[in-house]
Amino acid sequence: MLSNLRILLNNAALRKGHTSVVRHFWCGKPVQSQVQLKGRDLLTLKNFTGEEIQYMLWLSADLKFRIKQKGEYLPLLQGKSLGMIFEKRSTRTRLSTETGFALLGGHPSFLTTQDIHLGVNESLTDTARVLSSMTDAVLARVYKQSDLDTLAKEASIPIVNGLSDLYHPIQILADYLTLQEHYGSLKGLTLSWIGDGNNILHSIMMSAAKFGMHLQAATPKGYEPDPNIVKLAEQYAKENGTKLSMTNDPLEAARGGNVLITDTWISMGQEDEKKKRLQAFQGYQVTMKTAKVAASDWTFLHCLPRKPEEVDDEVFYSPRSLVFPEAENRKWTIMAVMVSLLTDYSPVLQKPKF
């Protein structure tokens, strides 16, 4: 019947000399997806297919539309509790997770090193089992990826990586949602990384090719990404027909790039290396000189907090900078992660183009 109505309206419009006026009807019913993530851990995007990552971004866009745009209240996590373990301090990760989980009707519990010492006062195995009996999921922001792996192995609930020495997957989800909103699609974009070969770069390397994105990365000598991760990223690039290049020249990495990306030069726990790192990263500041060799539609991303030596004010506060929409999207993407791992909810919004 809906199909017949579409045909009648289109024919009527054509008879009056107009082009087709009815293209699609969206009834607002949940869209059934083949992707099922409930009960999974999110430790690294290496463990997820392109379709699965797309699903989390689709769900992010759906929640953002329904809650922010339409003003709906969606208690999808009512009765659920989240354990938040933070060995490292945070603004965006903590705020986005606490407010997002609560907005969906759930109860987040924040634990610092004053409350819990992973593997110190209690073994990781025991901690994982206790958390499994009292919460529905755990988000952990830790120094060592190996601690996350142990928690995931011993727990019977989903474990989410809020940041580790190797990966920061939830940040990359926010980055990709921001880019999809700005460009309309991710496929074919060239990402230009200029900075440390750190957890952010590692997470991009584990996912960009799955969306058909190219990656050009510049890091100082001695600060390159993990060789094992590079090897796997090369495999992903080959499988997906994308380009991956590594260099020590920032301008070479920026050349033709759609998205200029950098991050802190000195991560938490590296404070003793500050003088050495500042010297090694000379010439890596993102400026308008960097942008001049980028694509004409270039934009800029930084996961924050930002220091002026990493990117100057002219770029950081320019209309091309997407850093603050990127920060806001941390909330919508972590909400989507929790909903996908803890519920059977399906998006209502039509799937965006990726």
From Swiss-Prot:
GO terms for cellular component: mitochondrial inner membrane; mitochondrial matrix; mitochondrion. GO terms for molecular function: amino acid binding; identical protein binding; ornithine carbamoyltransferase activity; phosphate ion binding; phospholipid binding. Disulfide bonds: none annotated. It comes from the Eukaryota. The active site is at 303. This is Ornithine transcarbamylase, mitochondrial. Homotrimer. InterPro entries: Asp/Orn_carbamoyltranf_P-bd, Asp/Orn_carbamoylTrfase, Asp/Orn_carbamoylTrfase_sf, Asp_carbamoyltransf_Asp/Orn-bd, Orn/put_carbamltrans. Negatively regulated by lysine acetylation. The gene is Otc. Keywords: Acetylation, Amino-acid biosynthesis, Arginine biosynthesis, Disease variant, Mitochondrion, Phosphoprotein, Transferase, Transit peptide, Urea cycle. Its EC number is 2.1.3.3. The modification N6-succinyllysine is found at residues 70, 80, 88, 144, 221, 231, 238, 274, 289, 292, 307. Pathway: Nitrogen metabolism; urea cycle; L-citrulline from L-ornithine and carbamoyl phosphate: step 1/1. Acetylation at Lys-88 negatively regulates ornithine carbamoyltransferase activity in response to nutrient signals. Belongs to the aspartate/ornithine carbamoyltransferase superfamily. OTCase family. It comes from Mus musculus. Catalyzes the second step of the urea cycle, the condensation of carbamoyl phosphate with L-ornithine to form L-citrulline. The urea cycle ensures the detoxification of ammonia by converting it to urea for excretion. It is linked to Defects in Otc are the cause of the Sparse fur (spf) phenotype. Spf mouse have an OTCase with an overall decrease in activity, and altered substrate affinity. PROSITE patterns: CARBAMOYLTRANSFERASE (PS00097). L-ornithine binds at residues 141, 199, 263-267, 302-305, 330. Residues 1-32 form a transit peptide. GO terms for biological process: ammonium homeostasis; citrulline biosynthetic process; L-arginine biosynthetic process; liver development; midgut development; monoatomic anion homeostasis; ornithine catabolic process; response to biotin.
